[in-house]
């Protein structure tokens, strides 16, 4: 019996495998170490670095950060209300860029609900109206004939519906209908790990709508869409046990754990995913705060859908900062990484020498400092992402894809990925 088979046997016990999705009895030490990685991020309180997902993840986990949690929520409220509710200024051309995205607003609403707050009052109503307007604008971009696309993504569209749903705020049937149609008729929604994230978020939005019955006329379509979403995510499971890849697995499990459609296939798939996640925790795979915040609820058998009725009195273990071991002085080792740019003319190819352990972002900065390479990034909750390379800005429905040879898209962001010696990194402008 292989290692994975043996672990599945231990996890499943001597009886038959369950037909529901449960992620229980995960090593508490591994979970604590995961939570400890979020603590330094809770000291970063600038508008650019505040991340509502961190607060949501902790509140739905078995861990707590004590007084730091309350201070973090207070900082979120100040930042989001001031930036989103202030009047638009003609004097500041970057005013719109400084405001949180609608996806971030949706996460902020989830954070409020994670503290057992219902959004309300004049300020709260204005935020709800902003999110509803965003959904209406996206609905118009998709079009009456469904031939268009959201200006942002179906992920943010789904997240917006979910955030309003947990606050018992109804959106129009036509808004829900656009997401239903996408799941029913757009197979490209599930082609890679990003699409697993999108499908899982859409499924959680549908789950909330099903449980809350906010759109009763759409109930039958919602039920069928949830069945379709579950089937597609289960089919996306890799031989290693991940849904899409390791980083898309937490959101997929959040959806599957709340499934009202039990089956042996579901139970087996979740046991396999749990075994894979256990291995990833032991290898310290999760370092990005957004990914950690999506995983922590899973390890406590919770999901964003539980924010319909959160349990704010549940006991949670207090996190203590990890003890840091002073780094030993070492002679730095250098590695060589080949950097290529394709999809534009002229192309670019250059070898960069950097200290071992450098992030891809560090490598790009080094190439910029010592040659003609130029790049720009934009901050996001998952870290910086490329917006411009060699002066070429990604246009509408374009993005700069990052790959490593042989033609493998990176699963991590440029701030998290650390290339190895001799590796080739390609930046490719692609459409979507």
UniProtKB/Swiss-Prot annotation:
The keyword Glycoprotein applies. Keywords: Cobalt, Cobalt transport, Disulfide bond, Glycoprotein, Ion transport, Metal-binding, Secreted, Signal, Transport. It is found in: Secreted. Cob(II)alamin binds at residues 104, 152-156, 193-197, 245, 248, 294, 400-402. One of its GO terms (cellular component) is extracellular space. Coiled coil: none annotated. It holds the Pfam family Cobalamin_bind. Its main location: secreted. Expressed in mammary gland, kidney, lymphatic nodes and liver. Disulfide bonds join 21-270, 116-312, 165-208. Residues 1-18 form the signal peptide. GO terms for biological process: cobalamin transport; cobalt ion transport. One of its GO terms (molecular function) is metal ion binding. It comes from the Eukaryota. Glycans are attached at residue 94. Belongs to the eukaryotic cobalamin transport proteins family. Primary vitamin B12-binding and transport protein. Delivers cobalamin to cells. Interacts with CD320 (via LDL-receptor class A domains). This is Transcobalamin-2. It comes from Bos taurus (Bovine).
